[in-house]
């Protein structure tokens, strides 16, 4: 299967989105389609053997819209060599696209208002008692009034011709949209007004001057058509302006990419170049206050780097030779050089932007209701409008009243509010997540996370740091009460033994020795004893490091219960012997992260059951569990890496949604099996296989924050869907005149157009509230 993203043009409402979806879904070989009205894009999963991107574009064209594949290439070939492009710097900003659209709408709106003011004044002045020139009030000049209104309407229709073009085109294709509602409503008003002008001409020709004036007052709807078009444009303008704010997070990420960089040549000369021209392997210099242009590894120098833009972590991270740095992070203090490793679309920044945009291109399950309604909404509205006209004609015999209600039904109906409810909230929610260092790979993951009832935490690297460290150094005491050796001597002995070992415990001990400036001595006859430890000879001395079994074999007596005491504290003891005598013990533990206990408490407050899964034995696992306030029943111990997926499946079979949190190193199958997989502490490696959500920081608190953000986003979507359905459920009957017998009031099409415009604006404005979302557990 292949997946491609397409730009789709011409979509204006949820009905358009539904028609494009339906047209592409019908193609053989298309597996799934996700059309995003807000972004004007479409993601398609398809079988290349059965259908091509050209076939997909043709299907969209036949439906009355335009489509083109979005190029995902990251390299441009020039003069026979690949030149890396800056993925982030050259991504088209969705915000700027929307701002350009809003600017064009603003021009249309200004022109519309300039001509609408005199049109409305002339057309409604006689009803509202406004003073009018005699040329418009004298019975002999009724045609002057009608012609003036018609002339003033022409520019309004001209600048808003898109509603008519798109609307009637959708009718021709048998897939009417919101533009069709506006076009038919405005056209009906204009057509009836033109018909009234012919009646007036006949009346004037036969000397019925008074009747002609009455016809002009009662049957001209030019100002109604002009007001409808202008108010819809007001709503579209405000809506587009609001939508441009929803992409603020992506816009901010794109703006982080610097445009230039300083390249250091082999002879030491420095040259400022365009970031586009940087190639992997080049050496660059970054000075204090500058943004790092690409990903790389520090060569010389040291500094504190602000990585908050990528991870949400506000505390600068110290960087020295050998450390990695990422594009768009900011150098705060010292100057350093680094070698570029990933450039253009391969940088962590570009991948984050792409991931957020891809998430916005997907569809949340909650959107299915809106899609189903939108698919039949416009045809149903046309039927209701026709029935309204017929009923009013039958009851009153008045074309004016029948036309007023029928047009009001058309223009008050708003499928846009339904279509915008989900994508706007998803865009703001995923953008907010990116600001917090929480990356959702799909809208479905964002929705599913809110329903998670159980969170399974892989112990190593999630609850703990994932890097064992020395916790205790205990020198053995001889029978006479004297120490077997000094602490420094014990560490020298440990360094000599462990320097050749590849065991994780050995790495922790060597790190401790290096930190204390202890240099490992050379040993002879080094041997690893499987399942026990290591032995070696240092001069005439036989030395060993290992567990109780190895000590017993060496004749070194370990105090009864000492190993169990360390295990009960979640520590792994390593015993050291010299010539058959126990000389000391060094305990190593994978330390619990500072925020783990608080994060688990926060998850409990959210009503989530927490389980810890580990390959450690139960004694060690329960010792860790006690430190984070988990009970023994919440611990799943002695689990082989291959069995993690099975345990997740068993929890799912027991009922409820399950989320799995791991570092993605040996738990990818479990992450994929879970209803939502969260990869934690990935840093720049955001493309973890199997993970639905990527947590940039190694902070378990982000799991609780992600759940809170998910719940807030879906709550916002439900609010928008409710109000969109409620608005149409009340507005359409009101426009049809259902409440006329009770109120004696008939809704004007002008008020209907205003209400329709405001409904979409309200939906977008409500979604924008997510930009101020703050989890109960504040981000550091």
Describe the predicted segments one by one.
Residues 73, 200, 204, 209-211, ...:
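Juxtamembrane coupling segments of multi-pass membrane pumps/enzymes
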Residues 28-46, 50, 220-222, 251-346, ...:
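Conserved cytosolic catalytic loops of P-type ATPases
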Residues 99-260, 372, 473, 744:
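Transmembrane helix-loop-helix hairpins at the membrane interface
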């Amino acid at each position: 299967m292949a997946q491609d993203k397409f730009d789709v043009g011409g979509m204006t409402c949820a009905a358009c989105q539904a028609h494009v979806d339906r047209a592409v879904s019908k193609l053989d070989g298309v597996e799934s389609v996700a059309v995003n009205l807000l972004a004007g894009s479409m993601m398609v999963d398809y079988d290349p053997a059965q259908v091509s991107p050209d076939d997909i574009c043709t299907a969209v064209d036949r439906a009355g819209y335009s489509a083109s594949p979005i190029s995902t290439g990251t390299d441009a070939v020039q003069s026979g060599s690949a030149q890396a492009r800056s993925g982030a710097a050259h991504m088209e900003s969705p915000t700027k696209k929307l701002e350009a659209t809003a600017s064009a709408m603003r021009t249309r709106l200004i022109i519309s208002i300039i001509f609408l003011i005199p049109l409305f004044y002339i057309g409604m002045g006689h009803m509202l008692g406004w003073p009018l020139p005699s040329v418009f009030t004298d019975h002999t000049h009724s045609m002057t009034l009608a012609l003036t209104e018609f002339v003033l309407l022409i520019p309004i229709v001209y600048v808003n011709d898109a509603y008519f073009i798109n609307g009637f085109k959708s009718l021709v294709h048998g897939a009417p949209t919101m533009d069709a509602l506006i076009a038919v409503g405005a056209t009906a008003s204009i057509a009836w007004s033109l018909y009234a002008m012919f009646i007036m001409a006949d009346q004037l020709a036969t000397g019925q001057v008074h009747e002609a004036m009455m016809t002009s007052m009662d049957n001209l709807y030019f100002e109604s058509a002009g007001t409808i078009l202008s108010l819809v444009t007001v709503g579209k303008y405000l809506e587009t302006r609001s939508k441009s704010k929803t992409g603020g997070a992506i816009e901010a990420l794109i703006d982080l990419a610097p445009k230039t960089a300083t390249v250091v040549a082999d002879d030491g000369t420095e040259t400022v170049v365009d970031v586009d021209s940087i190639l992997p392997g080049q050496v660059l210099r970054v000075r204090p206050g500058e943004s790092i242009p690409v990903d790389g590894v520090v060569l010389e120098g040291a500094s504190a780097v602000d990585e908050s833009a990528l991870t949400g972590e506000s505390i600068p991270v110290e960087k020295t030779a050998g450390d990695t740095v990422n594009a768009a992070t900011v150098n705060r203090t010292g100057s350093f050089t680094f070698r570029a490793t990933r450039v253009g679309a391969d940088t962590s920044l570009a991948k984050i932007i792409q991931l957020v945009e891809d998430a916005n291109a997907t569809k949340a399950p909650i959107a299915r209701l809106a899609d189903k309604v939108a698919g039949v909404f416009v045809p149903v509205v046309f039927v209701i409008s026709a029935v309204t006209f017929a009923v009013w004609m039958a009851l009153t015999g008045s074309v004016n009243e029948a036309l007023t209600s029928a047009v009001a039904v058309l223009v008050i109906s708003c499928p846009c509010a339904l279509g915008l409810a989900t994508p706007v909230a998803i865009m703001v929610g995923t953008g907010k997540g990116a600001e917090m260092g929480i990356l959702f790979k799909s809208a479905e993951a964002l929705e599913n996370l809110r329903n998670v009832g159980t969170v399974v935490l892989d112990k190593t690297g999630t609850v703990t740091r994932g890097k064992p460290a020395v916790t205790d150094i205990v020198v053995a005491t001889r029978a006479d009460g004297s120490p077997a050796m000094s602490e420094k001597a014990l560490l020298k002995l440990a360094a000599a033994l462990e320097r050749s070992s590849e065991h994780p415990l050995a790495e922790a001990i060597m790190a401790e020795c290096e930190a204390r400036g202890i240099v490992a001595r050379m040993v002879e006859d080094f041997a690893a004893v499987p399942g026990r430890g290591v032995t070696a000879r240092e001069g005439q001395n036989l030395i060993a490091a290992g567990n109780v079994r190895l000590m017993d074999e060496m004749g070194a007596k370990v105090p009864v219960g000492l190993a169990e005491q360390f295990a009960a504290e979640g520590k792994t003891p390593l015993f050291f012997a010299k010539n058959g005598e126990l000389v000391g013990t060094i305990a190593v533990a994978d330390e619990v992260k500072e925020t783990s206990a608080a994060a688990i408490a926060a998850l409990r407050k959210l009503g989530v059951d927490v389980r810890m899964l580990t390959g450690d034995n139960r004694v060690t696992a329960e010792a860790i569990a006690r430190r984070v306030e988990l009970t023994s029943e919440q611990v799943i111990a002695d689990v082989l890496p291959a069995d993690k997926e099975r345990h997740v499946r068993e929890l799912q079979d027991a009922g409820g949604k399950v989320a799995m949190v791991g570092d993605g190193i040996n738990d990818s199958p479990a992450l994929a099996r879970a209803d939502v997989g969260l990869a934690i502490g990935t840093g720049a490696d955001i493309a973890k296989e199997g993970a639905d959500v990527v947590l940039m920081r190694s902070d378990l608190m982000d799991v609780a924050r992600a759940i809170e953000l998910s719940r807030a986003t879906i709550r916002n979507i439900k609010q928008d869907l409710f109000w969109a359905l409620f608005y149409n459920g009340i507005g359409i009957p009101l426009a049809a005149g259902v409440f006329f017998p009770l109120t004696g009031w008939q809704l004007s099409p002008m008020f209907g157009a205003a209400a329709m415009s405001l409904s979409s604006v309200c939906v977008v404005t409500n979604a924008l509230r997510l930009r101020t979302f703050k989890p109960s557990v504040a981000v550091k």
